């Protein structure tokens, strides 16, 4: 089976057993996007500090806001989360789903002027195998080859119908880099990609600037933006991403015109801004799964009974009300409602609000008042408020809870270590939006965020997780997902708290901006 064009629909995402071309001839013949005007300097306010720009090694959304405008991937996702060809011109998939042969688009150049070849794709995948945060998606790979300059062949150890779903994930995407940069250590990747914008400067805690790449070649198979792919153009001269972590200051800058757009508008400001004719609001309903997860390598959260007691004590209505000013939905699942894999398996352990049960579990655990550190930050008020409310709920059942408040990059970095914290607060966005195995990958080997001893997650969970990826039918994969989710709840590998929307805003003279799971500045222009 060969696909030569546009969207791909996978069994995991759409319930079929094959990858199917979703584009139509009429779409191919439709008029392509053209910048209504070219020029100007776009300034966009981000809600958090950007911790780093090495997209292979960090799941931080703040990083994706910048890097996904600089880099491309072999395959990405469209707005419906179907795999979408990007730097791949076509893909041929063997009937047994073991050999994936990609033809690379010709004439694409890196920002350093070098022409893209299959050698660069191979080098990018090899670096990701070595340092990539989600490198487990490539564990199934047996070999990779480049028979010629425009062909990249991946041979798997076993049949994997969901391989395209895995490599198209943009949570920590396999961005394509020049082969000469493939040996760069983690967190030291030079910012040279093939995207419509190229890197200019990164001033820590202040801003990141990118500019139009004049030799960028748009993907003419498409007519406009499609997720992180499609037909992309840099209409503005430069984009400055300013790190405006205080919500009030960011909103004020938007109102005065100091910035053209804001990544996040707090609930308290939305009604006022909705009445401002100079500002346009956009809302993504299912954006953020508010979540906290434990460190299971350090006491007392290395004790399952302590973790279960903490889970039993939590009142999600109280936590989510404080986190979101009322803009939330409870969600006993690791999927958004309406997704193909949505299940409430294990949901009986969600939002228990059972202090008596919590005290009983604590008594059985042998807990002796050890400190439980809740690692959070103030840049994301929802995370700080969740930790604050949860700490009071834990104290009410006799747990010695204490907030550990750092700035976002420092908190994120500490959460990757095995010591110094017990629960970390974050939000999973693209992880959940993409659905399927990707929604649970953070709990599986080797990228298990809950820091199990020897970097080995719960064996039963891992068994069910593996079955999601290897199942030959959607029903098989759904059943495996339900079993994995139930086990995650039972072992308290992570605690989902609720679903929150995302409201973004731009000035009325900004054209072409569309909200997504990261800030996309392609096809965006500014009216004088």
Segment roles from a protein language model:
Residues 33-35, 305, 351, 397-411, ...:
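Extracytoplasmic/peripheral linker and loop segments enriched in polar/acidic and small residues
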Residues 197, 329-364, 380-383:
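Structural transition elements
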Residues 96, 111, 155-173, 192-249, ...:
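Aromatic-rich, solvent-exposed beta-strand/loop patch
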Residues 272, 297, 301-339, 385-386, ...:
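Periplasmic-binding protein-like
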Residues 43-95, 126, 192:
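N-terminal lobe/hinge region of extracytoplasmic solute-binding protein
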Residues 48-64, 87-89, 114, 136, ...:
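A structural "hinge/loop" feature
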Residues 28-29, 34-37, 136-180, 185-203:
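Surface-exposed binding/hinge segments that line
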Residues 246-247, 359, 363-430, 446, ...:
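Ligand/substrate-recognition segments at binding pockets and active sites
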């Amino acid at each position: 089976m060969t696909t030569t064009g546009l969207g791909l629909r996978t069994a995991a995402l759409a319930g079929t057993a094959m990858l199917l071309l979703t584009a139509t001839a009429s779409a191919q013949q439709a008029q392509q996007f053209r910048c209504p005007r070219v020029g100007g300097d776009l300034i966009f306010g981000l809600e958090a500090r950007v911790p780093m720009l090495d997209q292979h090694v960090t799941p931080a959304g703040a990083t994706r806001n910048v890097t996904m405008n600089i880099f491309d991937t072999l395959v990405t996702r469209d707005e419906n989360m179907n795999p979408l060809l990007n730097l791949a011109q076509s893909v041929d998939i063997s009937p047994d789903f073991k050999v994936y042969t990609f033809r690379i688009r010709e004439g694409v150049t890196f920002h350093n002027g070098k022409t893209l070849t299959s050698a660069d794709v191979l080098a990018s995948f090899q670096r990701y195998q070595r340092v990539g945060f989600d490198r487990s998606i490539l564990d199934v790979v047996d070999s990779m080859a480049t028979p010629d300059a425009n062909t990249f062949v991946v041979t798997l150890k076993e049949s994997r119908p969901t391989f395209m779903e895995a490599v198209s994930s943009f949570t920590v995407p396999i961005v394509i880099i020049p082969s000469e940069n493939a040996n760069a250590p983690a967190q030291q990747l030079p910012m040279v990609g093939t995207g419509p914008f190229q890197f200019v400067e990164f001033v820590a805690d202040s801003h990141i600037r990118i500019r139009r790449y004049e030799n960028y070649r748009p993907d003419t198979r498409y007519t406009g933006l499609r997720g992180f792919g499609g037909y992309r153009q840099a209409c503005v001269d430069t984009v400055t991403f300013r790190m405006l972590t205080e919500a009030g200051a960011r909103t004020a800058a938007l109102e005065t015109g100091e910035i053209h757009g804001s990544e996040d508008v707090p609930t308290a400001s939305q009604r006022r801004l909705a009445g401002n004719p100079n500002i346009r609001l956009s809302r993504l309903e299912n954006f953020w799964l508010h979540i906290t997860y434990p460190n299971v390598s350090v006491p007392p959260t290395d004790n399952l009974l302590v973790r279960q007691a903490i889970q039993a004590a939590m009142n999600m209505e109280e936590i989510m009300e404080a986190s979101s000013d009322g803009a939330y939905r409870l969600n006993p699942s690791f999927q958004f409602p309406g997704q193909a894999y949505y299940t409430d398996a294990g949901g009986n352990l969600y939002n228990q609000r059972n202090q008596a049960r919590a005290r009983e579990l604590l008594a059985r655990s042998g807990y002796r008042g050890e400190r439980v550190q809740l690692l959070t930050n103030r840049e994301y008020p929802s995370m700080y408020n969740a930790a604050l409310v949860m700490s009071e709920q834990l104290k009410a059942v006799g747990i010695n809870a204490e907030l550990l408040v750092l700035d976002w990059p420092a908190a994120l970095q500490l959460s990757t270590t095995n010591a110094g914290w017990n629960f970390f607060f974050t939000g999973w966005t693209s992880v959940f939006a993409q659905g399927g195995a990707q929604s649970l990958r953070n709990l599986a080997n080797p990228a298990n965020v809950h820091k199990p001893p020897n970097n080995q997650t719960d064996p039963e969970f891992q068994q069910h997780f593996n079955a999601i990826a290897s199942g030959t039918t959607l029903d098989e994969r759904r059943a495996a997902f339900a079993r994995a989710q139930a086990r995650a709840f039972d072992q308290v590998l992570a605690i989902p708290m609720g679903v929150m929307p995302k409201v973004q805003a731009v000035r009325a003279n900004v054209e072409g901006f569309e909200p997504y799971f990261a800030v996309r500045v392609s096809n965006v222009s500014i009216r004088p």
